[in-house]
A protein has these predicted regions:
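Structured C-terminal helix/loop/strand segments within mature extracytoplasmic catalytic/sensor domains
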Residues: 238-309
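Peripheral terminal and inter-domain segments
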Residues: 291-442
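Active-site-proximal binding-pocket segments
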Residues: 144-203
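A short, well-structured edge-of-sheet supersecondary motif
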Residues: 1-15, 251-254
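Active-site SXXK
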Residues: 4, 21-47, 75, 122-126, ...
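Active-site Gly/Thr loop motif
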Residues: 152, 199-257
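Active-site helix/loop module of the DD-peptidase/beta-lactamase fold
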Residues: 22, 41-80, 101, 130-166, ...
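Active-site-proximal alpha-helical segments within enzyme catalytic domains
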Residues: 118-125, 164-187, 242-259, 275
Length: 442
């Protein structure tokens, strides 16, 4: 989007402009705006101590000294007292409580250390002080009036509290709307929705990240739950390539949803493509009309689909292995047996995996996607398979639901033996689909 007009827009089927996508840490920026609104209402002050709002969550032995020093402003800056997300510790069910019962490592308000549990606590604070969920509170502040998706929502933790650090499911246009509000210092269409001074501070440098973060784009600094970028820009950033980027000097927005999990440097590639191919090519002059180029762009945008794996759709081994049951060695994945079926007529197949929960059947297409609901998880998926080598079939399963990620299941056949390679890139789920083991046909 540039100068208030969408220049190009494309979605990869089955996604479309109304599809909800997991936005991961972009949720944090929404929590930040809600905190700013609560401060404007006088329901909190940024320099308040967070422990004062959660006395019921403090350890029985007493509040930790460094935790007691922590302010809401420190949390917004990601300068907390923890070095990692506390609710990911083993056995935790009370996510908010874990933030206060986990022993802190350092004085807060000093150094940047990315901590999703901190923002989760801020989200819980929004619910506590507003009496509403995070999104409902922001809807009351203007998101509904501006056309934010009615079915957008935030997933909840085991206690039923919205996951303020990572749980939002919304459309690309929803994220563009929030970014337009942030660009306008909280105002849009001549009306002030969020507090101006707060929004200006939120997109300004509050924390240095240069020595802490691992990718170049994340080394440019941090505001109040908003990242800074090269060339004076700022971005709402969610894991795997969820980006809402705005660069003032070119007045350009870029919104992306993606799944770069499991691809080292994948998100940086998106940034680099934008800087190298789009940002650097923009100048103040309008381009001359070019109908051919325009039509080619439209055709390209309308033809996108989620990728499928490539390779050969057939193998000389198929007749020997189809429908045979392979009994698996004892393994960490809990898989007891595997059966593969490939239909040469329909170019589809299914994999039957017997584990501790019964038989899980995964349908797939050969070099094309088949869609279904993943057994045991009730999540939509797209799956394709290809013979990457004559004796090696690889199945790629894309989770395209409130969870986002990939599962890879590789089947290597050698005489009467089958070796299975499973790898998952879905956060916190599908742990039983990660490992290597072998089996033998009956």
């Amino acid at each position: 989007m540039r100068h208030g007009k969408i220049c190009a827009e494309t979605y990869y089927a089955p996604y479309n402009k109304d599809s909800l996508h997991r936005m991961f840490s972009i949720t944090k920026s929404f929590v930040s705006m809600a905190i700013g609104c609560l401060a404007e209402e006088g329901k909190l002050k940024l320099d308040d101590k967070i422990v004062d709002y959660f006395p019921e969550k403090q350890p029985e032995s007493g509040t930790y000294k460094y935790t007691a020093m922590l302010t809401i402003r420190d949390m917004l800056k990601m300068k907390t007292c923890h070095t990692k997300t506390t609710y990911k510790n083993p056995g935790v069910t009370d996510w908010v409580g874990s933030f206060f019962t986990t022993k802190p490592t350092h004085v807060p308000g000093t150094v940047f250390s990315y901590d999703t549990s901190s923002t989760h606590v801020l989200g819980a604070l929004v619910e506590k002080l507003s009496g509403m969920t995070i999104l409902d509170y922001l809807r009351s502040k203007g998101l509904d009036e501006l056309g934010f998706s009615k079915d957008a929502h935030i997933l909840t933790d085991p206690q039923g509290i919205e996951m303020g650090g990572s749980g939002m499911c919304a459309s690309s246009r929803d994220i563009l709307l929030m970014m337009m509000l942030i660009k306008g210092d909280g105002a849009l269409n001549g009306r002030q929705y969020f507090p101006k001074d707060y929004v200006k501070a939120a997109k300004s440098l509050q924390s240095d990240t240069y020595g802490k973060q691992g990718t170049f784009e994340e080394m440019q600094g941090y505001g109040y739950q908003i990242w800074l970028t090269r060339n004076g820009g700022y971005v709402l950033f969610g894991m795997g390539g969820q980006l809402a980027l705005y660069v003032p000097d070119k007045d350009i927005f870029m919104i992306t949803t993606a799944d770069a999990q499991g691809r080292q440097g994948g998100v940086q590639l998106i940034y680099d493509a934008f800087w190298d191919e789009i940002y650097s090519a923009i100048d103040s002059d309008s381009l001359p009309e070019n109908k051919k180029a325009h039509d080619e762009l439209i055709k390209y945008c309308e033809s996108r689909t989620v990728m499928n794996i490539t390779g050969s759709s057939t193998s000389s081994l198929e007749c020997d292995i189809t429908d045979k049951i392979y009994i698996c060695d004892e393994n960490a994945c809990g898989v007891k047996s595997i059966q593969l079926n490939i239909d040469k007529t329909t170019h589809t197949g299914h994999l039957s995996i017997k584990n501790n929960d019964g038989i899980q059947v995964i349908d797939f297409g050969m070099c094309t996607n088949e869609y279904g609901i993943f057994p045991g998880y009730d999540l939509e998926y797209a799956a394709s398979a290809a013979w990457r080598m004559e004796d090696y079939l690889l199945i790629k399963i894309q989770i395209i639901d409130s969870a986002v990620g990939n599962l890879y299941i590789g089947l290597s056949f050698k005489d009467s033996y089958l070796t299975v390679m499973m790898r998952k890139t879905v956060e916190d789920l599908f742990n039983e689909y990660d490992g290597i083991f072998s089996g033998r046909t009956m």
